[in-house]
Amino acid sequence: MSCSCLCMSLYRGADRIGRFYTAHCPQDMALCMHRQKLNPLALALAAAFALNAPAALADDEEPPIAVPAPPKEPGQTVVHADDMDGEMSVILHAKGNVVATRDDQRVESDWLDYYQTKNRVKAGDRFRMTRGGDVITGTTLDYNVDTYSGTGMDPVFSMARQNQTAVKPAPGAPPAKPVTLRGDGSQVDFQGQNQYRVYGSRMTTCDPGDEAWYLKSSRTDLDYNTGVGVAHNAWMQFYGVPILYSPWLDFPLNSNRKSGFLMPTFKTGSSGTEFSLPYYWNIAPNYDATITPHINVKHGNMLAGEFRYLQPDYSGRIYTEQLPKDKLTGESRYAWSASHSQNFGHGLSFGMDFNQVSDNNYFTDFGDQVAIASNVNLNREAWLNYALGWQGGGGNVTLRAQRYQNLTINPVPGDIPYAKMPQLTFNANQSLPSGFSANLISDLTRFDHPSLQNAERLVLYPSVSWNFDRSWGFLRPKLGVNYTHYNLDAFQGSPSHVQTRTLPIFSTDAGLYFDRDTQFLGRDHLMTLEPRLFYVNIPNNRDQNSLPMFDTSVNDINFAQLFTENRYSGYDRINGANQITTALTSRFIDQSNGLERLRLAVGKRFYLKDDVTQTVNQPSSDLLLSAGGDLTREWRFDSSYQYNQQLGMTERYNAQLRYNPAAGKIASVRYRFGRYEQLDNSNNYGPMRQVDVAAQWPIARRWYAIGRYNYSFIERKPIERLAGFEYNDGCWSLRMYSQRYVTDPTTTKNAWFFQLELKGLGALGNNGVQDTLRLAVPGYTKINE
């Protein structure tokens, strides 16, 4: 028989004299009643238990045997109190140190009325409720423990529960981290197990006792099923000062993605003062979009949009910026960028990358230093690739179409790269017995240019190599033939014609490895000695000046280039060679921690015959030297030196010293010298002598200074100056700095950055701050991570 039950076990002299619970009656229950008041027999039995109970015991006496209550079951309500009375199965009145529990819900109060039939609780004059990791205190409570619904007055709360996974994260995404939300209000409505509505609320994610910032709103809805909070008629207040108003503002209750407005961006400088307010649309776990209106005082209103998608077999991104009419030029200005990659399976894949802006000055007017430096030729390409595999080898076939938008101001024909319309490549390798392997590089390309000669070019480069690798050294000879065929179009009165070039190429790479234990700076080290020889023979006696230059340039000489067959990039020029490279490397490795304390290297190439592709030949290359290492865990030194022995002059050198004892503590100084270097993106060349000092360093409790000074001794002026500070309060962080940098010999840009980052909500300010600081200060660390 199912019924409501009352059971009391009374202890004489104890603080708490009763316990009340409702449940299905167990078989050994002594007392069970239907909905009626306690009759005289029940009261007599209860009194008899109380009168016959022994007196309270001293500490050394055995405790009495009490009649135990049935174990708590799911869905069971248990009430503890100093004093209880009521009507069986109808209402229970509890007073004094009241504690009521049901599953994960717990209510503590001065008094409590429990209505059994409705599973409803009324409590006051103070209450404290905990459920699901949340804690709410207040004055009065009216609450249904079955439906998790009700109302509390004058609430003070701390919400720290996990997301209830109603919205699944994207595949492979890390679990969402909870955000501890503290606050108060005039009233809280409990709207289910995972939902709240707070009226007259103030909320913050700062630690207890810290109210540096809070969100004040007329009403806030917290939904832990979706992990999203929504504030209505909301003011963001920072140290009591309103800094942002929104009639509707949503925010994350964990680290999951969500739809809603992101923090606004403020920036000012040579490009004008700008305000932007992004809206993030979490369309699905694998689709999202960001729509950003920009209000630019100097140029006008711009709209930007980004759409991203991700599927198991493909992914991509589309981005645009649209300015219908520039206030300065009166013209429409825009930027487009799109990328897509797709795997069709069975080795077949596809990709594309497309970029376009309305004019050559677009990034100068709207971009930052990073955008200006990296966008001279905007890439537009699409490719289809097929990967093959077979026993002992593999290969791939790629079909590509590629051209560029060149942003050089007043370009000459040589500034504009050739388009590849199209390019077909096939590369393969096959392992052979006894360490041999066969290799093939092939390339068929149609080159197209608006003002230079067009042509088709075929390159075939088969080769055979042998790898002999041991712990003490290696030997890797290689023999191949490079065949190049050109079909040149008619150009400037010259008829179309064919040119070919066939060159055998032989190379051998060999090295030895020696090591021994030694003492260095008073510590045990492993010292290595690593000599290396690289020989190349290309019997090229042909003058190649009649051949076009489609995708070829002279590589800068460095240690990596010393060990290549060709000093040119691309296939239009192949140097004649009978040359040998010698190099020696020595390292000191700390045996206690594995740090490379010191690394020394020297290398030089010797030419045994003249190269017909060079107008001036030398008996040897420049001498290359390098030194570096972790002097300690905090100190790092790197340097390189290039010396022209024929001229008796230094070509270039670079030295850098960096001190990094801890995160947020970094200082570096670098000196660069070049006799003839590219100075900017406009292909201006000349001598370079620059010193570059950068640092991020704590200057007081919670305060960090950050700066960079890059000075040119040739131009006698700074190339870049950056100075500012950062403040980390724990609950919020602030970054403010100014930057001035040169974009070309006649143009200098200024920028001022501001970013206020609120714990748990994100950053208020310029979204490019982190990229700028990491570029300016090597080793920069975000102080609130």
Swiss-Prot record:
Predominant place of localization: membrane
Keywords (A to Z) from UniProt: Cell outer membrane, Membrane, Signal
Top-level taxon: Bacteria
Gene Ontology cellular component terms for the protein in this record: cell outer membrane; transporter complex
GO BP: Gram-negative-bacterium-type cell outer membrane assembly; lipopolysaccharide transport
Keyword Ribosomal protein in annotation: no
HAMAP family: LPS_assembly_LptD
Name of the molecule in the record: LPS-assembly protein LptD
